[in-house]
Amino acid sequence: MTEDIRVRYAPSPTGHLHIGNARTAIFNWLFARHYNGKFIIRIEDTDSARNIADGEKSQLENLAWLGLDWDESPEKPGEYGPYRQSERNEQGIYQPFIDKLLTEGLAYKSYKTSEQLASEREAQQAAKQAPHYVYEYEGLTREEREAKYAEFEAKGLKPVVRFRVPEEKTYAWDDIVKGHIEIGAKEVGGDWVIQKADGMPTYNFAVVVDDHMMKISHVLRGDDHVSNTPKQMMIFEALGWDIPQFGHMALIINGETGKKLSKRDENVLQFVEQYKALGYQPQAMVNFIGLLGWSPKGEDEIFSLEEFKQMFDETRLSKANAKFDQKKLEWINNQWMRRDLEEIMPQLIQELVTANLVSPADATAKADWLAQVIKVAGVEGISYTREIVDLVRQPFFELGDITDEMVAYLTSEEGRRVFDAWESAYIALPDDATAEDYLNAIRGIQNQLEIKGRNLWNPIRIATTHEVQGPNLPEMLVVLDKATVLQTMADVKSNYLN
């Protein structure tokens, strides 16, 4: 592309950063960065009743956590600010364009009450008509319409401003993702509100003014905005402005139900900060989200944000719905944890502090030992960092109960022989014995007693760790405190073998 690319991510601060919104932001960022364009963040806060106090903060902090940067935003203003719609409204940016449409007869003031609107909808339903707004000034001249305005104003009524929909027109565009789309003006539900009674512009009006004034070249957003596009095209055309290119990404569906991902789906965590709190890695989240509705060439599935940027191709955005597969996210996150183990080690150790397995002081003083424990336990079996707690809890920080199955191994004739041989071998090994030393000692017992497999390994593991399975035993023995292991073995002998 040779044109100047300017794209925007424009969230409403009515909630925290949702997976779907994160995908919109990521793909806009990729589009901008791949083509050396600009990525703008604009806050669409016109619905003040639904805005939450930390909604904007959550959006920006979590976007930054994902590794995204931006060229313009409320906190990084450029020449096209302000970047909050509420502030733009306070500065009177929208009103001249409302007035222009009113003056040209392309919009009008409507004083209908909610009761009148409800009555009209009921009548339409009774007549089996599609819901639509009924124009109340049919046949009136501009002067007669102005007189009606004055009459309503005298009664203390506050109007909304509605755009006069050209009913016979069809709005068509070549969607970046979905291809050619046509929607008839009649499908938008009649004349629609562009300014509320409190003077605040509605979303579909404000977004057009903002996109034009901020020189947005491409609008890449979710499939649920397709129905908004003809309304926005109406305003672009009415004001004589160029229309940006639109692209509507496929829905994200619940991988289990096959239905659109809903905030009511309690089986799926849907907000980025929830995954962040569990210890998912930002690279993994970007990797997973970047594959929701977009496919690279080849079979590889592990990509960094930089790799995504280099190979991004908007023509590979899928028309088919994207399946949210929790298991795949867990697999991708595990791949990134294994790849970046040294980098995330402080985070893993902090999980142990949070779970009260170690004190903050020991987390620092024993950092090397804790890192050894984590490496021996292995992150291969966990999906996110918080799971490291249960992985290392036993036997590194506490011992589990000895079960009847374990007792059977210990008290069998072979088990007693293995225990006695292992006790002697372990005591004889030096404190700095290596994993190879421990393995050779166990092999020596195998050769001496001619016992192998579970009948050899289980009595040793039970006597040492109170477990029948777990990480590599010789490697565990290297990091376990020898005095502690000797006490564990003494207790086992006293309780079960005397």
UniProtKB/Swiss-Prot annotation:
GO cellular component: cytosol
Enzyme Commission designation: 6.1.1.17
Classification via Gene3D superfamilies: 1.10.10.350, HUPs
Entry similarity comment: Belongs to the class-I aminoacyl-tRNA synthetase family. Glutamate--tRNA ligase type 1 subfamily.
Sequence motif: 'KMSKS' region, positions: 260-264
Organism: Leuconostoc citreum (strain KM20)
Residue ranges of coiled coil: none
Keywords, alphabetical: Aminoacyl-tRNA synthetase, ATP-binding, Cytoplasm, Ligase, Nucleotide-binding, Protein biosynthesis
CDD domains: GluRS_core
Positions annotated to bind ATP: K263
EC class (word): ligase
Subunit structure, as described in the record: Monomer.
Catalytic reaction equation(s): tRNA(Glu) + L-glutamate + ATP = L-glutamyl-tRNA(Glu) + AMP + diphosphate
Motif 'HIGH' region per record, residues: 11-21
Any single GO BP term: glutamyl-tRNA aminoacylation
Cellular compartments annotated: Cytoplasm
Protein encoded by which gene: gltX
Record's protein name: Glutamate--tRNA ligase
Function, in words: Catalyzes the attachment of glutamate to tRNA(Glu) in a two-step reaction: glutamate is first activated by ATP to form Glu-AMP and then transferred to the acceptor end of tRNA(Glu).
SUPFAM superfamilies assigned to the protein according to its UniProt record, in alphabetical order: An anticodon-binding domain of class I aminoacyl-tRNA synthetases (SSF48163), Nucleotidylyl transferase (SSF52374)
GO molecular function: ATP binding; glutamate-tRNA ligase activity; tRNA binding; zinc ion binding
Principal location: cytoplasm
